[in-house]
Amino acid sequence: MTGEVGWVYTLHLHTPLGTTGRNSARHYTGWACEHGLLARLKSHRSTYADAAMMRWCARAGIGWHLSALARGTRADERQAKKHGAARRCWTCQAAA
């Protein structure tokens, strides 16, 4: 359901995933249902995670932490992915 309100979250990776420059990722933005945020975050730690990027992080031993959280829909998540995650990442904002 696109209109269901849940949580739009951003994770900050402790080590960039990928190579360098535009081929690397430092953040992951996702959506979780109203009461499913903790379960969704826990699933990201698994080497069998639904999200491919988080699965690779788990397999590579890359740690991460929650770095932004807001109420929103899946449409809000897609919109957030179009704009740089570092803009809403608490960790990156503190380092700037």
What does each model-identified segment do?
Residues 1-42, 46, 57-79, 84, ...:
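GIY-YIG nuclease catalytic motif and its immediate N-terminal context
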Residues 47-53:
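Major-groove DNA-recognition helix of helix-turn-helix-type DNA-binding domains
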Residues 53, 85-88:
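Secretory pathway export signals and precursors
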Residues 88-96:
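Extended, charge-rich low-complexity interaction segments
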